[in-house]
């Protein structure tokens, strides 16, 4: 069962104009403490977009309240893309996000986020040896596993590059690249990965599943001319998940 701890309620996703947003920062810690008082035990905590430094700090505290020694801590440091921070974040925001990253078992930045977290100048054309150096530097913050998303493996292939510092081991996996962009693919990837981990898959197998399932969802979505506005139509691809899990 999923237990949702909302940080905000939006009338639509951020590609829509003039959306309404209700900030729920003040409720994060009270909800976490209430769950703790009711002896709620979590197998995993997965965090995504956080709208302010205060939210990041409160989620760090919520992890301390909710996570036990065996709880998976999965952090998607969603704050930037294309070489720039998202609108509303100042240049100090990555410093706050680094505190949350330090608590993670698995962290899944894109290249922009990895560069911001490590103080590395952003470039789109880093080769694999340089990307490995960035992951090593990011691992110094404290996460057990670092997964770089959106890694190009040639003009027709896109995937992930993962690093486990305790073993000084890298893992590469790519799948077919599709020339399309939809909101929510990062959330979809992370959710599929967490789900696979909760089903007992090792991280490398979970990453393969997440990459392949995200590709399937994009392929399905490309058939719908209205899809770019509403996001990835993952519901139509859910029937493929049992097959992916059994591989």
Positions of predicted regions on the chain:
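Short pre-catalytic strand/loop immediately N-terminal to key active-site residues, enriched for Gly-Thr
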Residues: 170-183
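Short beta-strands and strand-loop turn motifs
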Residues: 44-47, 74-82, 108-117, 148, ...
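Charged C-terminal helix
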Residues: 204-247
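Short, charged, surface-exposed loops that flank catalytic or proteolytic processing sites
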Residues: 121-130, 198-209
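Short, small-residue alpha-helix embedded
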Residues: 180-203
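Conserved N-terminal subdomain of the carbohydrate kinase-like
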Residues: 1-87, 235-243
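Conserved phosphate/ATP/ADP-binding segment of small-molecule kinases
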Residues: 87-170
């Amino acid at each position: 069962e999923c237990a949702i701890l909302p940080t905000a309620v939006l009338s639509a996703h951020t590609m829509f104009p003039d959306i309404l947003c209700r900030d729920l920062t003040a409720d994060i810690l009270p909800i976490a403490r209430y769950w703790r008082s009711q002896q709620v035990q979590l197998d995993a905590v997965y965090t995504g977009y956080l709208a302010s430094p205060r939210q990041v700090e409160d989620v760090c505290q919520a992890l301390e309240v909710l996570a036990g020694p065996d709880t998976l801590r999965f952090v998607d440091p969603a704050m930037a893309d294309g070489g720039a921070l998202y609108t509303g974040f100042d240049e100090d925001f990555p410093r706050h996000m680094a505190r949350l990253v330090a608590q993670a078992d698995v962290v899944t930045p894109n290249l922009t986020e990895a560069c911001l977290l490590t103080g590395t100048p952003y470039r789109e054309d880093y080769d694999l040896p340089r990307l490995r150096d960035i992951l090593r530097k990011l691992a110094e913050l404290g996460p057990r596993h670092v997964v770089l998303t959106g890694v190009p493996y040639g003009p027709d292939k896109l995937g992930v590059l993962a690093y486990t510092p305790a073993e000084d081991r890298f893992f590469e996996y790519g799948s077919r690249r599709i020339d399309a962009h939809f909101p929510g693919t990062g959330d979809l990837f992370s959710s599929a990965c967490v789900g696979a981990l909760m089903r007992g898959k090792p991280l490398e197998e979970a990453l393969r599943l997440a990459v392949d399932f995200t590709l399937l969802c994009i392929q399905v979505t490309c058939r719908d001319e209205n899809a770019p506005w509403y996001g990835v139509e993952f519901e139509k691809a859910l029937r493929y998940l049992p097959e992916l899990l059994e591989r």
